[in-house]
From Swiss-Prot:
The keyword Kinase does not apply. It comes from Rhodobacter capsulatus. The gene is ihfB. InterPro entries: Hist_DNA-bd, Histone-like_DNA-bd_CS, IHF-like_DNA-bd_dom_sf, IHF_beta. Keywords: DNA recombination, DNA-binding, Transcription, Transcription regulation, Translation regulation. NCBIfam families: hip, PRK00199.1. This is Integration host factor subunit beta.
Amino acid sequence: MIRSELIAKIAEENPHLFQRDVEKIVNTIFEEIIEAMARGDRVELRGFGAFSVKKRDARTGRNPRTGTSVAVDEKHVPFFKTGKLLRDRLNGGEE
């Protein structure tokens, strides 16, 4: 599912809301999650999961084509840990 499909589905299930309003809400939610993560904050949605940022230390990598060693800089990467409700649902648990 892509963002536009999510917006259409939410608008369909909530006929009292205009699609443009749903789009603003969804975009605001994503933007707030991004802003929080950019500050280094953790965003927890109970039952669904938690978004956080993990630091990957600098390391020496290898160019797969040439086999030469390459320095890989330290970087911060997004991380998502699933919540129990989501894991249970994916594994055939309660609906």
